[in-house]
Regions:
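Charge-rich, low-complexity N-terminal segments
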Residues: 1-95
Length: 95
């Protein structure tokens, strides 16, 4: 079953620009392997992300992300089953 999760989080103080680029590179590889699509927005030290794919895959990714030391204060504000992807052509994009 397809599902989507949306969350916000705060970047930790030690996060640098190169870290953001690494996050995106890692996300593209991971997401392709696991059939996950989505979007990542980063501004003013805050992340906003939507991930979509198989329910088990995005739940596993969300748990992995919530343990990543590069950000904290996670708030999941969206969690729903979906009939189609909003970001079906995207492995991951950052804006």
């Amino acid at each position: 079953m397809l599902a989507t999760i949306g969350y916000i989080s705060n970047a930790t103080e030690h996060l640098k620009k190169g870290d953001i680029e690494n996050i995106v590179k890692d996300a593209i590889l991971y997401n392709k392997k696991h059939g996950i699509t989505g979007i990542l927005y980063f501004a003013n030290g805050k992340f906003l992300q939507f991930i979509e794919g198989d329910r088990a895959e995005i739940e596993a990714l969300y748990q992995k992300l919530s343990k990543d030391s590069r950000h904290n204060d996670f708030v999941k504000f969206h969690d729903a089953d979906i009939s189609e992807r909003a970001f079906g052509e995207w492995d991951m994009a950052i804006r």
